[in-house]
C-alpha cells in the first residue's frame, strides 16, 4: 500500500469517515484543507436515481447559478446580422460564421462555451469532430442553440453551468471557488438541485437525489447532509 503524504495525512486526520456534513461546515472544512497555490474550484457531484442506459432517463440541462462560478468564461457565437451585433454587445468574445469556423478548424479553440443561432447550424454542423470531443458543440437542450444568442451569452458570462449524467448516473459541475462565502456556495448548490428536480425524468422511480458530494480540485470529497440544504 502506498504511503500517505504529509498533506494526505493532515487531511485524513480532519475528516470523519462515514459522516454527512452540514453544508456550511463542509465548505469551511474544504477551505481549511486547501493548501495549493492556485484558486481551486469547488465542485459538486450529485448521484441521481436514474438509469442512464435508458434514453428517457439521461438528465441534461443548464442553469445559471445565482452567484456564478468565479471563472472567466470565453464565449464564441456563430450568428450574423443584427444578432451578431447583439451578441457582441452582450459580451461575446468572438462572433462570426464561416470565418470563425475556419479559425476553429485551424485549432483556435480557446473558448469555454460555443453558441449558435439556428440559421448558423449549417456552418456549425461541419465542426462536429472539432467541437464534439471538447464538449463545445452547441445544443438546444442546454440553450446553446437559440435565436436569442444575446441572452445565451449573458447567461454564460453570468455563471451558467451545463451538466449531463455520466454512465453511473452522476452529474458533476463546478459551483464556485475556494474563498467563496459559504452561504453563496450553498445557494449555488441549492439552485442546481432545484433545477435537477425540475427536470426529473417521469420514469425515474424511488429516491431521485441519492447523494451530494462537495469537493475541491485537489481536495477530498465530503458527503453533504441534504437536510442542511433548502432545495
From Swiss-Prot:
Belongs to the universal ribosomal protein uL1 family. This is Large ribosomal subunit protein uL1. GO terms for molecular function: rRNA binding; structural constituent of ribosome; tRNA binding. It holds the Pfam family Ribosomal_L1. Binds directly to 23S rRNA. The L1 stalk is quite mobile in the ribosome, and is involved in E site tRNA release. Part of the 50S ribosomal subunit. The lineage of its organism: Bacteria, Pseudomonadati, Pseudomonadota, Gammaproteobacteria, Pseudomonadales. InterPro entries: Ribosom_uL1_bac-type (IPR005878), Ribosomal_uL1 (IPR002143), Ribosomal_uL1-like (IPR023674), Ribosomal_uL1/biogenesis (IPR028364), Ribosomal_uL1_3-a/b-sand (IPR016095), Ribosomal_uL1_CS (IPR023673). SUPFAM superfamilies: Ribosomal protein L1. Keywords: Repressor, Ribonucleoprotein, Ribosomal protein, RNA-binding, rRNA-binding, Translation regulation, tRNA-binding. It comes from the Bacteria. GO terms for cellular component: cytosolic large ribosomal subunit. It comes from Pseudomonas savastanoi pv. phaseolicola (strain 1448A / Race 6). GO terms for biological process: regulation of translation; translation. CDD domains: Ribosomal_L1 (cd00403).
